[in-house]
Amino acid sequence: MITFSSGIQPTSFWQRAGRFHFDTILICALLFLLAWGTIMIYSTSAVYAGLRYDNSYYYLQRHLIHVILGFGVITLATLTPYPRWRDWLPLMMLIMLAMLVMVLIPGIGHEVKGGRRWLRIAGFGFQPAELMKVVLIVYLASYLERKRPFIQSFNRGIGPCLLVSGFYMLLILLQPDFGTVVLLATTVLMMLFVGGCRIWHLVACVSVVASLGVALVMTQAYRMRRILAFLNPWEDPLDSGFQIIQSFIAIGTGGWFGRGLGESRQKLFFLPDAHTDF
């Protein structure tokens, strides 16, 4: 959280840059997690990067570039007055719509392991669904602020924002990216609760979302296998349960505090993508 040093709001970028105060605890937590994550990136990727790229620092270097870019974005976003985000929101929504449609087009969207979720621009790859997480929060915050007098009405209050949010989530589901859709749906429901919608409206929304989620899981074999593997990975130890079993082995051999920095074994090609989201 960042606050200005006086009640007068600075008007220029440099005035804002010189007159805000950091939330020390939040910044320290951010830096700690960032440092720890960087160490883990190198620890899990060094062996694989050394074999594939002949450079054990390949993924670490790429990660540090992303960190620098991320700090730049955080700084600019922090120094941007909140009303500006509201003014830019229609353009942001249009850009997200274009990108989420583009990613579904063969030859434009980049397919990785069965999911077409990536766009590549000037050699830089990114997932539009990740950007949608931020844009959706901005949209909901702006909508709930504007519709505050009608928030307890379904037709004039939460209904329209549910339709808009659902449409964007449908585009993401077509990639398919079920996990991101679940996260976005949870975000929408939480923001509606905080925004003051009627409890029975919220209960109805939760019921519909849960029913759709169960239906989507049961109608797709690979999703069902993931659920069953989570409950009992030993039924399919070489396929859907493989990574969970590897995590058991890692915890069993390392105990509470692990084997020591750089001494883990599961990264030694026992896992297909130890350096990504495992």
Task: Give names to the regions the model predicted.
Residues 1-19:
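Short, Lys/Arg-rich, polar N-terminal cytosolic tail immediately upstream
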Residues 11-12, 19-21, 97-99, 248-249:
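A short linear-motif detector with a strong N-terminal bias
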Residues 21-27:
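Membrane-interface helix starts
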Residues 23, 177, 236, 273, ...:
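Acidic side chains
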Residues 27-35, 39-43, 49-243, 249-251:
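Hydrophobic alpha-helical transmembrane segments of multi-pass inner membrane proteins, especially
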Residues 255-278:
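Long extracytoplasmic/lumenal interhelical loops at the membrane interface
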